[in-house]
Amino acid sequence: MIETIQADWIKSEAINLENCCNDNPLKILGPHFYEEQWVIRVWVPEADEVKVNFKDKTYKAESINHKWLFEAILPENPNSNYEINISRGGITHTQHDPWSYREEWMGEVDRHLFAEGNHHHIWEKMGAHLIEDKNQKGVMFCIWAPNAKSISIIGDINSWDGRHNPMQKRLGGIWELFMPMMKEGDKYKYEIRTQQGHIYEKADPYGFLHEVRPQNGSIVSKLKNFNWSDSSWISNRDSSSQINKPISVYEMHLGSWLHESTDNKYLDDNGEPRDPVPAADLKPGTRLLTYPELTKKLIPYVKERGFTHIELMPISEHPFDGSWGYQVTGWYAPTSRFGTPNEFREFVNKCHEEGIGVILDWVPGHFPKDKHGLAFFDGCHLYEHGDSRIGEHKEWGTLIFNYSRNEVRNFLVANLVYWFEEFHIDGIRVDAVASMLYRDYLRPDGEWIPNENGGNENIEAVKFLQQANHVLFQHFPGALSIAEESTTWPMVTKPTDMGGLGFNLKWNMGWMHDMLDYFEIDPWFRQFHQNSVTFSITYNYTENFMLALSHDEVVHGKSHLLHKMPGDDWKKYANTRALLTYMWTHPGKKTIFMGMEFGQRQEWNVWDDLQWELLEFEPHRGIRNLIDDLNKLYKNEPALWKNDFDPYGFQWIDCNDKSNSVISFMRRESDTNEWLVIVANFTPNTHGSYKIGVPVEGFYKEIFNSDGSRYGGSNKGNMGGKDTINYNIHDYQNALELALPPLSVSIFKHQSEK
């Protein structure tokens, strides 16, 4: 007989369980040795009767001190080799006891690495994991919430009632619970009770799958159950630096590339129709494509265009389509809008089979305030700074990560490793880096806090970015890490051991703004703005630059690329072709946004798909043909990519002909006599005999002309090429006398034989 003091303690603990205020349920629940006998205590809210099955015998569990706390006496130590039989409302079922699993899931070494911020595979411990332990199948849950008073697992398994399954608090603010009755596909959340008594229902920060919006629960999902076939791709990728290869990127948004009619159902592997995910109210009767459908339609399209990589705007789970994916709540989960994690793995796998790399937009700079997300996670500012002057982007309505906290950095750095390791991606583009680097970013005076040295640099964010890139290249030496950094912060693409941020590419925002400003000017006035088209070369070799015409430039009233151009339709098409061709010949890797490859007219709208009907018209097919041929030429001519980051690879012939708005230059390959001559005419004037100097006499084949009829141009040019003439110009003794078509860029290559 248990003594009175013991009975009072048990009653007190049971009341705490009922009120969801118990952080140590193992202290009372599960197997215990009391007064020379083994006792099983189980907590079963609203149960009518409970029995314990052990070694082919059944032992009745009596309700003790509380109507939902049951106790059975067994003849020996049962360990976890018993089951509980529960009768509730006339329904009886048998299950293993959640509190029979008493061992720590996250061991001392794991906790130590996590607390240091150096557990690069923390997702293998945190979150929901399908495991088999001691012949028990179930799900192990593990979460970090050091300030919580209590946490429970809620879901379909317990009617979303937090009184059923309280978690056990471990050292380091870690909470754990093994749920033997749960399985793959079960929905769940964490019910977190704060020290102040408030209750939050949170999705799993480490969840591998979440519900389709507008629902926001997490879903138990297997992690390592996909058979990859891209080992040769990965081996080749990591054997050498990728930035010394041609890189031509198709940036796109999976949800607005192409829609499908809701009448056309998607059938899964079992032939069953999948519930459609509506595209948007703006276009009723349409649905989003699934990952398998995108695999069949998008990958062949990108391959046909000749791009080397696809860049996907954020696919981490996010609740609001209108955020374009940049307000993430499910960092470890591909969005379920398009399907399952394994279906996305198959998408990546197929990309690699077709020779296409996959880049993901990654958003470590901020996160939304959605109640089910990271904000105020355990009743305190856990992931974000407590002071809004450093912890909030008021203009964006989002919160900023507390990069000074080891566990927060670990969450993000491990997330980076996760996408490369678990989904075999090839690169990331880090969004809004400038917003991370500066404490006063988009903040008026008085609404930001200087750093310890009195400056505006965010020292903690700098260290985080350096750590993230260092760890990334340590694990994946062939990765691409691209910074969207819009200021003149130094050494963005220099290694971390040199004091740099450690990226290997940076979007050239200056080039983008200068070129768009220049091309929006009426061609007759471009002579007064020649510097806009030439200035980028003066700083081109300070960083490893990527030229990007991105999604940001075709929204919010900015017009799509074609409609930025002045003049009538003929001039718009010609200007677009000239800009794209100049971009492909300018030093730097390439990125364009979807729709630019065929001259989309309308601004990008996340709620709609692209204007594919425009391809019925020749000028739009011409722009698409131009991109196809530019990508083919680009990959076949090393002079266009091999020395992107070496001044040897570029040389002006003439950049001073302002009155004609003509520029000419050479692109050179290293250690060879291979070079290309590029001449751009940025006015509608046709020049019949325009002379430029060249270093070697002979025949120069015209290998590309943006004014060609295949591209919708007037087909003016140089009849396949030109022989040099003996004429001293531009410090050369040989010259080419060329026909320059209107609003065009022409490319010539010296031939050893005509």
UniProtKB/Swiss-Prot annotation:
Function: Catalyzes the formation of the alpha-1,6-glucosidic linkages in glycogen by scission of a 1,4-alpha-linked oligosaccharide from growing alpha-1,4-glucan chains and the subsequent attachment of the oligosaccharide to the alpha-1,6 position.
Entry's Gene Ontology cellular component terms: cytosol
GO molecular function: 1,4-alpha-glucan branching enzyme activity; cation binding; hydrolase activity, hydrolyzing O-glycosyl compounds
Gene: glgB
EC number of the protein: 2.4.1.18
Keyword Glycosyltransferase tagged: yes
Bridged cysteine pairs (disulfide): none
Higher taxonomy: Bacteria, Bacillati, Cyanobacteriota, Cyanophyceae, Synechococcales
Coiled coil ranges: none
Record text on subunit structure and interactions: Monomer.
InterPro entries named in the record: A-amylase/branching_C, Branching_enzy, GlgB, GlgB_N, GlgB_N_E_set_prok, Glyco_hydro_13_cat_dom, Glyco_hydro_13_N, Glyco_hydro_b
BP terms from Gene Ontology: glycogen biosynthetic process
Keyword vocabulary terms for this entry: Carbohydrate metabolism, Glycogen biosynthesis, Glycogen metabolism, Glycosyltransferase, Transferase
Protein's pathway: Glycan biosynthesis; glycogen biosynthesis
The name this protein goes by in its record: 1,4-alpha-glucan branching enzyme GlgB
Catalytic residue list: 431, 484
